[in-house]
Amino acid sequence: MRYLSGGLTALALAHPLTAQLPPLDSLQRASVVAGYHAAFLCSAVFVAGRDPASVAREELSPELLDSPGDTGRLVRPLRTGIDREARRTFAVPRYPDDPFFRGEPRLAVFREGRGCTLLPPGTSAAAAAAKLPPVPRWSAPDGSNRPWPDGDRLPSTPLPPEVDSQRLAAVVASAFAGPAASHHTLGVVVLYRGRLVAERYAKGWGVYTQYRTWSTAKSIANALIGVLVGRGMLDVHVPAPIPEWRNPLDPRGAITLDHLLRMSSGLQSSGSQTPLGYWGGIDIAADAASAPLERAPGTRWKYSNYDTILLLRAARVVLGDEAYAAFPREALLDRIGMYHTFPETDPFGNYILSSQVYSTPRDLARFGLLFLNDGVWNGERILPEGWVAYSTRQAPTQDPRSRSDGWGYGAQWWLLGTDSYTSAGRRGQFTTVVPSRGVVVVRTGLDPEPSRWDQSGFVARVLETIRR
């Protein structure tokens, strides 16, 4: 590692590309991969406070990276850097067929309370400062002396007698053992009846170290829509308020929020692969809204990042830009003590709640606890009555028998049988709720793809340590 003028840290990173994605031309692929690097480096350094070398090793290394692009096409190093004073990162794409070509640099900028935003290709930091939507003023309250779950001060009293603490500690420790080729656990938190009864972190990670939630963010999107339903601003069973679909002749106008929540919009999509949306610096909501209809709404289940993006598009329409910018914190995060959770946006101010949220295991445990308590927090109803039951009801267009793990799907939550449900994100991110046992189990990871972590089995072993 060497230091350049202006406080920039330069890293040379090379990687194989393994994802099978929609076709992009060579310039787009180069730009998307550069955007991936700039965005990850920005969030890891300025949101999570991690060391750049560990980011390169643990997230952008050849063994762990599943980056956007065609297999084997973009193997040349990218030049990346960090400007700590300006709190931004950059990555310079290199065209694979011409070693002398340099693409337009990709910049990601950090803003307090909002995390990092990846800019469109070629956008300068000065231009971004003038064009990026404003961020509401916010600073994280100090929760260190506030009692759990609103804060982080844990009780000193003994654990409930039904918890076998030694056996539970051994089960949690087992999550951090085993071959690295199989899994790489970052953190585990276990709640029982609201109390934090077990917690452990990998070396170099701690209570306040954030990591990307990946698709666990979709369950957070569910909660935000629930808040708006409770306020009477949205109805899941009427056509979604997407401006691009308002033409009476547009068949997409029949798509409801229920269809979007249950991944049954019928829209054309590349499923969980959205390279341009995530790393291209485009208006992700407009891109999602432009998708044509493939099947009649409500007749097909297809997991799609863009169905979730469109939920937030609807939220922005009914709230307006200013209220939308403050909405995740005002409506949910700050109300339940999730002060170390940062939902990020595209450069047009759209929350990317299909994936792009940075959080901690404790904050995710708080989120699971909200659902365990039927949407009530400290006696205050945050989610409307019946919302949790609605969210955990099987989607009619998805058959659990079609999956090897037997998981069903509700409304932005996966269903594990009749009495538990979970959020699930790539590389092993899980927030699992078991209502009949009063248990929440959070596991975060940096697993190689495809992850071989068995969350169902892990939760079962945790439950064995807590007597009924």
Say what each PLM segment does.
Residues 152-193:
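Beta-lactamase-like hydrolase cores
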